[in-house]
């Protein structure tokens, strides 16, 4: 199913004559159908213990699988602050220019926004200030900005900030206003299913300083890290409705 869906997407992209395509790996990377594409950039957001039945139960084994998307001589970007050795070894073997969060690019939170610094393709230092807070992890947005910087496209701070301000990801901190029995209610949809996503959700719930109570309608597949996903949420959610 996934392979055919990926093939259909490639066909549609080709017909549309796209200038750019952003492709997300379904699982791992090395053996994923998306890895058929010889990408210009390879981005690895973070390395956690997800899909352990397929990728192994250590960060090193997961990093080895994710490193399969890297290409010889093509930039490799990693948002993990502690990239495991197998990833670094693959970067060295391929001669891929490596851009690491905390070394080559980074972000810093401010009172009402955040700041970014990074590198252009020629090594020139770049910076953006007072960027808007987002409905998706800012670590990922910072990684995306570094990827954009390496594509050598026009660098206009105002337009980049506006693009971030308009960015929405359906199903990730996705707020919907509705009426329930004549009373206004807010629905928050989030499909995060690993500890990293749950931690980010918890951070944003704390920052929102909600009035009233949160009811969580919660479901998780058996192969996920249930304890890790639930750990950040006690104290933030008062009532639970658990789907079997």
Can you describe what each PLM-predicted range is?
Residues 1-16:
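Conserved helicase/translocase P-loop NTPase motor core
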Residues 75-80, 215-218, 238-244:
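Short internal beta-strands
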Residues 4, 17-24, 39-128, 141-161:
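Acidic, Mg2+-coordinating active-site environments of NTP-dependent enzymes
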Residues 12, 68, 205-209:
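Glycine-rich helix-loop-beta junction characteristic of Rossmann-like nucleotide cofactor-binding loops
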Residues 20, 32-43, 47-51, 61, ...:
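Nucleotide phosphate-binding/pyrophosphate-handling subdomain across enzymes
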């Amino acid at each position: 199913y996934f392979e055919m869906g990926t093939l259909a997407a490639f066909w549609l992209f080709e017909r549309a004559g796209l200038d750019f395509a952003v492709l997300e790996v379904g699982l791992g990377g090395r053996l994923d159908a998306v890895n058929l594409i010889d990408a210009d950039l390879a981005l690895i957001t973070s390395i956690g213990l997800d899909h352990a039945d397929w990728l192994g139960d250590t960060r090193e084994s997961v990093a080895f699988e994710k490193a399969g998307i890297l290409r010889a001589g093509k930039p490799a970007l990693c948002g993990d602050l502690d990239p495991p050795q197998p990833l670094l070894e693959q970067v060295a073997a391929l001669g891929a220019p490596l851009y690491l969060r905390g070394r080559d690019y980074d972000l810093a939170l401010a009172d009402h926004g955040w700041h970014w610094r990074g590198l252009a393709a020629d090594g020139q230092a770049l910076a953006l200030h007072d960027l808007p807070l987002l409905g998706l992890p800012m670590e990922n947005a910072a990684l995306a900005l570094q990827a954009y910087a390496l594509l050598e496209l026009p660098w206009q701070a105002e337009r980049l900030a506006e693009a971030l301000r308009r960015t929405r990801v359906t199903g990730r901190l996705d707020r919907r206003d509705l009426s329930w029995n004549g009373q206004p209610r807010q629905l928050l949809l989030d499909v995060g299913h690993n500890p990293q996503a749950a931690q980010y959700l918890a951070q944003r719930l704390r920052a929102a300083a909600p009035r009233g109570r949160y009811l969580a309608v919660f479901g998780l597949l058996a192969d996920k890290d249930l304890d890790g996903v639930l750990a950040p949420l006690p104290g933030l959610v008062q009532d639970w409705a658990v789907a079997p």
